[in-house]
């Protein structure tokens, strides 16, 4: 896992009416990630995992594993019901995957010990390295620094994806658990978080721009910051509506997925316009410093 610094939080393409997964489009996206040498995260919030049935999630993981992709695969682990989550880990144990992304329990807002005991249960079941996911905007609470400290010596606890939106949280995690890698979870924060010791990026933008994202993150991690304003403008455009609505709209517009469909409660009608997305796509493709890609 040490060599992968960019992980793409993959969208889950659907057919036109949204009642099934479009596996042809999914395979096309995954092939691009392999060529760009990016790792893959399946069934996260960008992948609309909460909108998928258990059967759909299992079928998707089986499909991707059968492709035998030449890249590392991380599977999202929900933070809702403990027993269903443990069953999910039992299923994944039989799959040739490389890691888990475990979300801070959502809605319940557990304290330090609640989080610690929750993750202990999951770490005991995990057969591959685990990345915790700090996403307070969705979970309603931060992954506590004390929770990280409590679990930092566990052999399966490998990394944290931090989507707090501030470098202060990353600094806290690095202070209490210097052995745990911290990945930036917000595309527009990677240049700042790289300067504070981030190990890389878990990206939404790399769904659309896998090669550019790979090169940009590499430069940030090497202490360079090529025209960060261009990257930030592009990333902000991908969040003009709830993720992954804009990303799917742009992927469809440029012909990488057949349909921009999302599942309720998300709706494509909440996207103001695709024009802004077209503008930033043109800007990224004309990015002179990365034009060799």
From Swiss-Prot:
One of its GO terms (molecular function) is 4-hydroxy-tetrahydrodipicolinate synthase activity. One of its GO terms (cellular component) is cytosol. HAMAP family: DapA. Its main location: cytoplasm. Its EC number is 4.3.3.7. The keyword Membrane does not apply. This is 4-hydroxy-tetrahydrodipicolinate synthase. Pathway: Amino-acid biosynthesis; L-lysine biosynthesis via DAP pathway; (S)-tetrahydrodipicolinate from L-aspartate: step 3/4. The active site is at residues 133, 161. Gene3D superfamilies: Aldolase class I. Keywords: Amino-acid biosynthesis, Cytoplasm, Diaminopimelate biosynthesis, Lyase, Lysine biosynthesis, Schiff base. Pyruvate binds at residues 46, 202. It holds the Pfam family DHDPS. The lineage of its organism: Bacteria, Pseudomonadati, Pseudomonadota, Alphaproteobacteria, Rickettsiales. The keyword Signal does not apply. The gene is dapA. The record marks 45, 107 as: Part of a proton relay during catalysis. It catalyses: L-aspartate 4-semialdehyde + pyruvate = (2S,4S)-4-hydroxy-2,3,4,5-tetrahydrodipicolinate + H2O + H(+). One of its GO terms (biological process) is diaminopimelate biosynthetic process. It comes from the Bacteria. It is found in: Cytoplasm. Catalyzes the condensation of (S)-aspartate-beta-semialdehyde [(S)-ASA] and pyruvate to 4-hydroxy-tetrahydrodipicolinate (HTPA). Homotetramer; dimer of dimers.
């Amino acid at each position: 896992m040490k060599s992968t610094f960019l992980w793409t939080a993959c969208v889950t393409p659907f057919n036109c009416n949204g009642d099934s997964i479009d596996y042809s489009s999914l395979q096309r996206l995954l092939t691009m990630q392999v060529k760009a040498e990016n790792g893959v995260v399946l069934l996260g919030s960008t992948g609309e995992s909460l909108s998928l049935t258990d059967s759909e999630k299992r079928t998707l993981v089986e499909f991707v594993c059968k492709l035998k992709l030449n890249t590392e695969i991380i599977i999202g682990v929900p933070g809702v019901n403990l027993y269903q989550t443990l069953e999910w880990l039992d299923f994944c144990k039989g799959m040739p995957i490389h890691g888990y992304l475990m979300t801070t329990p959502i809605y319940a807002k557990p304290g330090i010990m609640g989080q610690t005991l929750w993750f202990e249960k999951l770490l005991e079941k995990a057969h591959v390295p685990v990345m915790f996911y700090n996403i307070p905007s969705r979970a309603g609470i931060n992954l506590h620094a004390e929770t990280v400290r409590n679990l930092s010596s566990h052999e399966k606890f490998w990394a944290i994806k931090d989507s707090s939106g501030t470098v202060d949280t990353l600094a806290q995690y690095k202070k209490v658990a210097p052995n745990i890698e911290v990945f930036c979870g917000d595309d527009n924060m990677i240049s700042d978080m790289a300067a504070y010791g981030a190990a890389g990026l878990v990206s939404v933008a790399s769904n659309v721009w896998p090669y550019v994202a790979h090169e940009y993150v590499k430069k940030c991690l090497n202490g360079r910051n090529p025209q960060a304003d261009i990257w930030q403008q592009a990333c902000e455009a991908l969040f003009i509506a709830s993720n992954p609505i804009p990303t799917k709209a742009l992927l469809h517009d440029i012909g990488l997925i057949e349909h921009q469909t999302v599942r309720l409660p998300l709706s494509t009608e909440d996207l103001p316009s695709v024009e802004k997305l077209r503008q930033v796509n043109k800007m990224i493709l004309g990015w002179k410093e990365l034009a060799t890609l």
